[in-house]
Each structure stands twice: as C-alpha cells, then as structure tokens.
C-alpha cells in the first residue's frame, strides 16, 4: 500500500483535481507531471488527462468507479471520448446540478447520492456505476461526494455524520465506515483525498493523526 501527500499549485484539495477508481484515474491537464507520477505510483492505475465541461476541477465534476464514469450535462464529446476509450461505461447525468463528483459517493459496490436527484437520474447512475443507489446526506451535507470517500474496503465520512447516515453508507457500499477529516480539520474528506484499495494521495496539509485515521479506516496499512 502506498499513501503519499500532494498539492496542486499550492491547493491541498487534491480530490477536486483527480477522479480515480480501482483501474484508472482521470487527471486535470493542469496537474503537474510529478503529481501524476505520484498518482500512478500510489494507486497503481492507468492515467488519462482531460478537462470536464472545460474545467480542470475533474474530481468535483466526474463520478467514477471501475464500472463506469458519469459526466455533467455540459461535458464535451472529446472529453467523454477520452474516458470511454478506457473501456468503461460512460454517460451524462440528467441533472441541472453539474458537480457530479460532489453529488455521488461511490465504490464498486454501490453509491450514495444527493437527496434531490430524481428517479431518472438514479436509474442512470445505477446503469453506469452498477450496484445499489440510495439517496442520503452526511452531517447535513447533501453533496455526499465531497463529504465522504470510499474504496472497496472502507469509507471515511464527514465528522458530523449521524449513526443512521453511517449505517446507510455501510449498507450501500458494503464496507465499514468511520468519520474523519483531512487538511488540518476539513470535514470535506472527498475533496482532500484520492483513493482506491491499493493506495491514496492525500492533501499536503493532512496531519499525522488524520493520515493514520484515514489509513486505518480505508485499510491502507
């Protein structure tokens, strides 16, 4: 297991720039090459580079797992093509909300999603990502993809998450769930870490105790 720290042009919110699964990572063009090498090393994945809807905030805008990738409705065809060529299912989320990566907390077992997404959106998510899809919140935060992070072994969620919310995540994703923070106390763990079951890249400002908790909860030791 490899866990490394990184920032992008001084920004420790590494999860905003990169979306990753067990098999691949989608990285923004503005991410420096040395950070891309760390991603490859830590996660042991194939890396492709593209913007999403013309933005470098790939992690915030794209929801991925090993089964597929969900783009926002303003995504461009050449961006979608880059990910489709990885051989995974690709579709556009039918929603006016564009930050798809922030709307969806997923691993290869299922997904917890923003409570305001309609039934048609949930059907598309299930078709692309597979597994069970359930609406929910984490600590009063509707953008569950920003408030949580998961791999195939564990999940870490917003420290304000209730027992009921944590149980729902555990049931849907099929993993143990713990609360935690990144980058010196940020509750938005999904923004501060990129992870799969083989390793993680965490925000540069993450403290030793935070890192230890993340490693334990995500079984990265």
From Swiss-Prot:
BP terms from Gene Ontology: cytosolic ribosome assembly
Keywords: Initiation factor, Protein biosynthesis
Pfam families for this protein: eIF-6
Database matches in CDD domains: IF6
GO molecular function list: ribosome binding; translation initiation factor activity
Leader sequence residues: none
Similarity comment: Belongs to the eIF-6 family.
Function noted in UniProt: Binds to the 50S ribosomal subunit and prevents its association with the 30S ribosomal subunit to form the 70S initiation complex.
Name of the molecule in the record: Translation initiation factor 6
